[in-house]
Each structure stands twice: as structure tokens, then as C-alpha cells.
């Protein structure tokens, strides 16, 4: 956060941590992986709450993603991490694998909503994940200093829910 992603080096991290670059590379294969783990020490668990109706679940997903994207560490790191991920598909796969459990929960919730008749059966769970993450990411990138608020969450939820409900 202090110097920005583009100015961060593994050597600087090693020096500040009192270790060696070799030790860092044993744990993280790249700066992007190290920064990603620092920004996301654990995968977000927005859906640890009991399953509700799909509108409530979608609102919780949007709010949780917004809280993650507006944290100072993520705000500083994410543009650089995304650039590195775009240039390295293997890195992208490793980084995104940390979210597999969360994405599986979203998929399960959508399947259950289809089974309850709340959601169109042709809604692709992966598109829902992309829309929620993408809306938050774009807002964070386009509006520097943006802080998530209930009005934005409610409006975004209404738009997304309108697209998935029966």
C-alpha cells in the first residue's frame, strides 16, 4: 500500500521482513502471488450465512465483494495483480483457485434457487459470479476512493436480481 504494486519488489519485501528473496520464492512463485495472498489472506466467506432467498443471497454476495474491493490493500494491489494475471495464464489459474470454494457455494445456491423456482433455469452461475465481481471491480477502478454504501448495494442488487428471477 505504501509504495504501490508497481514499485514493490521481492528484494524490498525480503529486506523488510528480515529474510531472503530465496525464502520468499520458496513460498510464492511471484510477486503477484505474494501480494494476492497479502490482499486476500483467506478466501472471502460471504456466504457462510444460512441460505436464504436468492435476492438476499445476491445482496450478501454484492456487499461482501464490495467490502473486499474497497479495502486499502486490495485497492492498491489489484490493478497490478490483474495485469500480471492477464500476462500469465498459469498465475491466473493459481490465484483464482483460492476462490474455488466460494464459487462452488455460489453455484450451489443458484442451483437451489432454480430448484425452488426462484431463478430461470438457464442462468449460468459463472455469469452471476462474473457480474457481481465485475460490477464491484469496475466501480473500484473507475471511482477512486469509493466506499461501498447501502444505496449502491441495493441498486446493484436490484439490477442483478431482475436479471435472474423468474
Model-derived features: where do they sit?
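Short, amphipathic alpha-helix enriched in basic
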Residues: 1-18
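Short amphipathic alpha-helical segment with a characteristic S/N-K-E followed by hydrophobic residues
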Residues: 7, 30-35, 45-46, 58
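Tryptophan-centric aromatic hotspots in well-structured domains and transmembrane helices
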Residues: 27-29, 137-138
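Hydrophobic alpha-helical connector segments
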Residues: 46-78, 128
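Hydrophobic/aromatic-rich alpha-helical bundle segments in the mid-to-C-terminal region
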Residues: 92, 96, 100, 114-159
